[in-house]
């Protein structure tokens, strides 16, 4: 469990996870199938909205993103690794060309508008 600077509860969420990898073009033939396996593992363990994105300004940067419903689900998700999961992660670390380990962003989502925003739910009134 990573150290947190926000005081969140186990049921806080949803939690968005983004992991940045630096992958050279010559390694894409191995990286992309590993990420397909990663997607399968994440979904098996309860992740939602899994995505893989490539940075348009720095194409060596690939970002894996997914969501889990709560903080406790994220913690549990990290403890569900099988031997095969660990081997896939180790191989990803070998392909990663960054000076440090892949950067992990753990974020809690917050609504900026109420679920019943007046802009979208105003009744139509005739001004004539």
How would you describe each model-predicted region?
Residues 40-49, 67-104:
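An amphipathic, aromatic/His-enriched active-site/gating alpha helix that lines ligand/cofactor pockets
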Residues 1-17, 29-33, 38, 81, ...:
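Intrinsic disorder in cytosolic terminal tails and internal cytosolic loops
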Residues 62, 83-86, 119:
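Residue-level signature of transmembrane alpha-helix interfaces in integral membrane proteins
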Residues 11-13, 44, 58:
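Solvent-exposed loop and beta-edge segments used for protein-protein assembly and interaction
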Residues 15-22, 51-80:
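Short, well-ordered beta-strand segments in beta-rich or mixed alpha/beta enzyme
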Residues 4-10, 37, 49, 53-55, ...:
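Short, well-ordered helical secondary-structure segments
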Residues 26-50:
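Short amphipathic alpha-helical segments
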């Amino acid at each position: 469990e990573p150290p947190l600077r926000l005081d969140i509860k186990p049921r806080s969420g949803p939690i968005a996870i983004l992991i940045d990898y630096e992958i050279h073009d010559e390694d894409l033939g191995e990286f992309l199938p590993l990420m397909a396996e990663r997607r399968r593992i994440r979904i098996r363990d309860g992740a939602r909205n899994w995505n893989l994105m490539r940075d348009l300004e720095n194409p060596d940067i690939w970002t894996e993103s997914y969501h889990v419903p709560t903080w406790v689900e994220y913690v549990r998700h990290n403890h569900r690794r099988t031997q095969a999961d660990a081997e896939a992660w180790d191989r990803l670390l070998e392909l990663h060309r960054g000076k440090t380990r892949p950067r992990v962003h753990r974020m809690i989502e917050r609504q900026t508008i109420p679920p019943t925003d007046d802009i979208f739910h105003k009744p139509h009134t005739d001004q004539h």
